Amino acid sequence: MAEGGGSVQRLRRQLESNSFQAEQYVKLLSQQSDGDRDLQEHRQRIQSLADETAQSLKRNVYQNYRQFIETAKEISYLEGEMYQLSHILTEQKSIMESVTQALLYTDRSEAARELQTAFPKEAEEGKVRNLTTLLEKVEGCKNLLETPGRYLVYNGDLTEFDVDNMALIQKVHAFLMNDCLLIATSVPNRRGIYKYNALHNLDDLAVVNVKENPPMKDMFKILMFPESRIFQAENAKIKKEWLEILEQTKKNKALNEKQKQEETTPQLPVVPEIPANPFIDEDGTFDEVEVDLTIDWIQELPEDLDVCIAQRNFEGAVDLLDKLNSYLEDKPLTHPVKELKSKVDERVRQLTDVLVFELSPDRSLRGGPKATRRAVSQLVRLGQSTKACELFLKNQAAAVQTAIRQLRIEGATLLYIHKLCNVFFTSLLETAKEFEMDFAENHGCYSAFIVWSRLALKMFVDAFSKQVFDSKESLSTVAECVKVAKEHCKQLSEIGLDLTFILHTLLVKDIKAALQSYKDIVIEATKHRNSEEMWRRMNLMTPEVLGKLREEMRNCGINNFDQYTGDDCWVNISYTIVAFTKQTMAFLEEALKLYFPELHMVLLECLMEIILVAIQHVDYSLRCEQESEKKAFIRQNASFLYENVLVVVEKRFEEGVGKPAKQLQELRNSSRLVRVNPESTTSVV
């Protein structure tokens, strides 16, 4: 024994060696072995070592399983927090970049205006000189300099793409002048030299931002009826500069043309001043009432809003907006008020975008419905109730879907269904309560919640059906699972939400299929027993077995079974009829757990088909049997079937459904009239 243990240890060390080579080991083993017996012994040693290793591995897994689960949970939580932190940092970075770019652009614009004011002639000459220098590098555009007052505003390299299929067309260089946009293409083998491509008047074009769709990003579209062109900038910063400068240049051109038109308009003769009407109030209704916007908090309002948005102080930002709206509520809409409102509206758009991002499903979903309350409440205060409702429900749909996907399918189906129902209906209940709290004053949003609840319930039923019906579970398991789902669904009625009818509608197809499938199994089993029918009494051998059968019959609802039992553990009923009774009543009990009105006719038809198989078999046997003794025994079985089994089926069906089944009564009453050809050797089913 010690020698065997030592050989196993040597074998273990040999296999654990870093220099172990399987092919060399097998070759050497086959050379050294004396025969088949040595190889069998060596195989046993390897097998015992493998079993020992497997047991050791299993013990280690069990010992560290709890620690592994806890570690996995911590990693999952940490991943969610890091993901949320990454989004916050990205958002902060974009806000800081936008603020920096706005400040730089403002500084550059002010410096340029100051320089132009101080040296107007030199500035004009400098612009023309720059335009001349650049256009000397473009072939075919000498006539552009003939237009007086034209100067260069901005220029840079762009990449043009096809509008239809986003295919790369060419590299271009764009020159933006104060009244037009010149597009030039690169000349091959001549660095820095361009060729004229197109010239667009600023009045005839419109600039449109193109939504980011990686890898196609940093793009903008220029519309020139009836065509359009798409260009890509080197980065987001340059794209933003192009969009802003193009829009500003178009505005400046329109403003200059308007000023020139006003200057050329002849002056109207001066109308002598009409004496004041002494009956009009001296204050006059013709003077514009001035609104005091010099208050410190109003002057600092745009900057304060920027700070609140950057610091994610959404409540503070909305409080400032409410304060401003209250102050301006009874004030006239003067020009300074319009300017202030335009500045504030831009901040409102930024705040709305941030709140919308907070409610996006990409955010961490671990907080549940309450985690969205802050963003939802502020969107509602901003008058965005519809958008808040839509985003809240999308967020919760993603959260519910994620929770369902994270459920592990292990163990019995019923255990999984308990977990699934608990997760889904608890989430639905919490969502409903949070929705009622967030949108208490917005009754128009409730219809959206009902629609969302139906879609969420369909998602639940898909997961439920996949596990319960697609896996071909027994009817008893199906009944228990459906019962659990119904009980959880009824809990929603405490908040006035009854989805039971929708649950029935979504499940009715699968339950019908399950009932018909199990009905076929019962019929097939009954036919198989009928084919082996010998019409003999049952001898149960021991009183214990007989007592067990009596208990089973009482559970089936047959209370007078004792009159069919004899001495010495004999039962005066055929095994086929007894088995049919137990199987039919078991089917009926499980089917009644699944019952709802839409299944009434399906259940009734299934029962009638099952009963008809037994009735026709008894009727056929009674007519074909020649021995008087067996014939009397068959009549006794027929009496038990008609007067006990069918009566109990009718009674139990009426108790479970709430109304009698006339079809079952008619079947029992008319079954004695069934006639079968005595010369036939097969049952009519």
UniProtKB/Swiss-Prot annotation:
This is Exocyst complex component 8. CDD domains: PH_RalBD_exo84. Residues 254-263 have a biased composition (Basic and acidic residues). Component of the exocyst complex involved in the docking of exocytic vesicles with fusion sites on the plasma membrane. It comes from the Eukaryota. Residues 151-251 form the PH domain. It comes from Xenopus laevis (African clawed frog). GO terms for cellular component: exocyst; growth cone; perinuclear region of cytoplasm.
